[in-house]
């Protein structure tokens, strides 16, 4: 992903976002499985004006470049220091949505709710590499994980009960030219980070996302089944007092939306256009060839990740996504999507004094919390879940957090195959290479994790 320009990433005020809500349609699921399916496959090229090399937009380049940071948009609220922990207890409702490049997107099938009783999401415990590949979620070269911190026999299980670790990783597609599957690295990295979080025996506040990223990377390097590859990563650790620490390496990123305004966004790290910071495993043979013929591989490390601390409040929505999202929609698009869905589902309410968090937030994030709002093929709403029914049902996956994740992923999917809509990648390509005519979206793998904060004290008073 490339760093979008300031003008294309600027977020408008909350008022302009609310005005756009009337033009947006509430998220709904079509019975047609082709709902976000691209009608045609697309291969676009970006040409360097000073070379004859043609570069596919989905293939990150790995030249020997001087490290240079780039910026993405701006804060709608001023940059602030890490706030004092909230005295109330915060719990987190987490869901993910993903779609592989060139594959159909199913809003319900491609949504995954995190259940802390299960411990982890997006992780395969199968030791057979072939079985692991077969059981991966439909995310292509992208990967995600969500895990509780610590197990149930830990000495700190009471203090760590609501602590959550989460993240996304985007495999570097350029490794396919060396006959390496980039998905092995990204999925392996997320799997090892989830295992590290699950087996954490100390207080959750002692686990930092950069430390988690380092542990996952060390395991990937030691894994003989992952012979080569690379990945970007965006990782977070959320504590029960609302403190969230985020570590971002590369062009995956985060956006925090608070009551119809962008409260925080991450800054992408790139060496140049379409060349993000990336963790890498480089075989000795390839290193030797590079030393003989000249040149060098890009090698960044977990210590290079940028770290940000935020304080989540009741009703906040945190989006963690790969560049398949940020290459096709900008912060303004994400803000309008989240605001419209939160208000139309009743999670936020618009009042004379501003946007407020609804009393129904906890119920909407429970299993099947939004099932009544989704139509069936006959047009009638799905029946509400019977509380006495212990068997899990597909409609239980329809929660507020899964709807938000699927909405962002679905919008990015549609924008990626739209020839007439210039996304952030297209605008940046036009700025870097004005002689080339790159238009439309960028077809890529897409992965989104959504985290909603619930203040247990406020939610209990409203029941």
Positions of the model-derived regions?
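PP2C/PPM-type serine/threonine phosphatase catalytic domain
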Residues: 2-463
């Amino acid at each position: 992903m490339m760093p979008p320009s300031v003008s294309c990433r600027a977020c408008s005020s909350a008022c302009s976002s609310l005005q756009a809500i009337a033009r947006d349609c509430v998220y709904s699921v079509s019975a047609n499985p082709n709902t976000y399916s691209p009608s045609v496959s697309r291969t676009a090229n970006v040409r360097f004006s000073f070379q004859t090399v043609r570069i596919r937009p989905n293939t990150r380049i790995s030249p020997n470049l001087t490290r240079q940071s780039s910026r993405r948009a701006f804060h709608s609220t001023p940059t602030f220091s890490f706030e004092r922990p909230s005295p109330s207890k915060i719990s987190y409702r987490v869901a993910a949505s993903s779609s592989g490049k060139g594959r159909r997107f199913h809003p319900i099938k491609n949504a995954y709710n995190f259940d802390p009783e299960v411990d982890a999401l997006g992780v395969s415990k199968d030791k057979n590499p072939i079985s692991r590949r077969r059981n991966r979620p439909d995310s292509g070269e992208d990967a995600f994980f969500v895990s509780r911190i610590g197990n149930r026999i830990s000495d700190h299980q009471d203090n760590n009960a609501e602590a959550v670790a989460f993240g996304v990783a985007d495999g570097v597609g350029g490794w396919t030219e060396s006959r390496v599957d980039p998905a092995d690295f990204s999925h392996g990295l997320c799997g090892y980070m989830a295992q590290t979080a699950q087996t954490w025996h100390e207080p959750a506040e002692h686990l930092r996302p950069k430390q988690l990223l380092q542990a996952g990377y060390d395991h990937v390097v030691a894994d003989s089944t992952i012979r080569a590859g690379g990945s970007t990563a965006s990782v977070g650790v959320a504590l029960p007092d609302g403190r969230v620490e985020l570590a971002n390496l590369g062009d995956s990123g985060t956006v925090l939306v608070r009551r119809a305004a962008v409260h925080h966004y991450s800054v992408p790290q790139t060496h140049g256009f379409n060349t993000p910071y990336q963790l890498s495993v480089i075989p000795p043979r390839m290193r030797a060839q590079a030393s003989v013929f000249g040149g060098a591989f890009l090698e960044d490390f977990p210590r290079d990740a940028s770290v940000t601390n935020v304080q989540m409040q009741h009703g906040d929505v945190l989006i963690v996504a790969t560049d398949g999202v940020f290459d096709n929609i900008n912060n303004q698009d994400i803000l309008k999507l989240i605001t419209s869905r939160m208000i139309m589902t009743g999670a936020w309410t618009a009042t004379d004094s501003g946007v407020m968090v609804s009393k129904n937030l906890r119920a909407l994030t429970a299993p099947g919390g939004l099932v009544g709002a989704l139509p069936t093929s006959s047009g009638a709403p799905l029946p509400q879940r019977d509380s006495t029914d212990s068997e899990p049902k597909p409609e239980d996956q329809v929660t507020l957090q899964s709807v938000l994740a699927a909405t962002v992923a679905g919008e990015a999917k549609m924008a990626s195959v739209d020839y007439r809509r210039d996304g952030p990648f297209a605008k940046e390509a036009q700025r870097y290479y004005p002689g080339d005519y790159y238009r439309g979206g960028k077809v890529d793998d897409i992965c989104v994790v959504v985290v909603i904060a619930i203040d247990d004290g406020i939610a209990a008073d409203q029941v």
